[in-house]
Amino acid sequence: VATPRLVVLLLGSVVALSGCGNLVTTEIVGAVGISVDTEGDPVVVVAVCDGYLDQVAVVQGREGLAEDETNPVVGTWDAAGQLTGVSELDLAAPGSDWQTRTPVSLETGEHYIVTARQVDADVQASQVDFFGRDLQGMEPGFVYTGAAPELDEHEAAAFEAASCPD
């Protein structure tokens, strides 16, 4: 026979645990930025502060999508090894650091979100969210971070320090 105290403890535990369904456990270990090369083609820049990441994905924004629809995938690139420190992915010409070498171009009027993550763990970098038009007139040597319409601009040399403020 359960005592009133035991029943209260059990009910309290059930209520306390029922709120855990939305627990977010993703570990953020760096930042993703967007830049351009000397031809004006988009370049993803990933700063990893701790550990490693091994995949970059570009998806379109949520404009026009139903709540249950996923963002359209523009491309996913698997790194040839572990990304540490600062790494770059030229979207128009992925180099030998990437197993996936499919080039893509970004449309001026489209909204994009770029992420970097560790495939086998709940680890990622903070994403960058921008419109293709944000890259028009951008000079090489600078990196945008954050989310449109208020992107933060960093000199490329200072991007890692800004992303990993230890």
Where do the PLM segments sit?
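Bacterial signal peptide processing site
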Residues: 21-24
